């Protein structure tokens, strides 16, 4: 009944004209020699070793090498005890900007010692209860 309604609505000639518009497609055969390769997501990580670099800068110019390590994806521990307080404060500001740019993290782990990490490191725990503000330089 629905077919008759459609025939009367569109006309039988219209339906016959449209029948020739669609061709049957041939089945595409896939090559028999394809192999399904399974690659572990963590396979690249197993071969890479994480690295933490230790620095005790004496000049502001040393910040370039420290920032380069962060940009390469390495964590950095920086001891500022051998620096002038004003220069150390500038260096901390520079490293803070570098860490922010790479979406990393910077934590104080000693009176004048900082840990800077890139995004792929996680810092857990807190040492702030052991640190006292005894006139810190920065």
From Swiss-Prot:
Disulfide bonds: none
GO cellular component assignments: cytoplasm
Pfam families with a match to the protein in the record: SepF
InterPro entries (UniProt xref): Cell_div_SepF (IPR023052), Cell_div_SepF/SepF-rel (IPR007561), SepF-like_sf (IPR038594)
Stretch forming the signal peptide: none
Complexes and interactors: Homodimer. Interacts with FtsZ.
Name of the featured protein: Cell division protein SepF
Organism whose genome encodes this protein: Limosilactobacillus reuteri (strain DSM 20016)
Gene from which the chain derives: sepF
